Amino acid sequence: MNHPVAVPEVMSADLPAGVFLLDVREDDEWTAGHAPEAVHVRLGDLGARLGKLPHDRELYVICRSGNRSAYAAQALAARGLNTVNVSDGMTGWAVAGRPMVSEDGTEPHVA
């Protein structure tokens, strides 16, 4: 019987500087607003992109609210990666006043 892998969590306001931040939201959410240093891989594409993710450092995984990122962090941890879920997601990121950029030149926001 497979059991979910326990993954640590962090609130976006407490995210250390310089981490590898993996954003697993959909393309339209990413375009609307994301952390400047984040790397975008849609949740549905994680399996195909697994080999391109760093295996030698912690991956902080973020989505809009923390649910998809929790699933992604557990799935990646089950494959041997060291993951941390950003439990309040980009919604918490915006509330904490952390920087955001958009891909389409509009005012960044959480979609």
Can you say where each PLM-predicted feature lies in the sequence?
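Rhodanese-like catalytic fold shared by cysteine-dependent sulfurtransferases
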Residues: 1-20, 26-58, 67-111
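Short, surface-exposed ligand- or partner-binding patches at beta-edge/loop junctions that are enriched
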Residues: 62
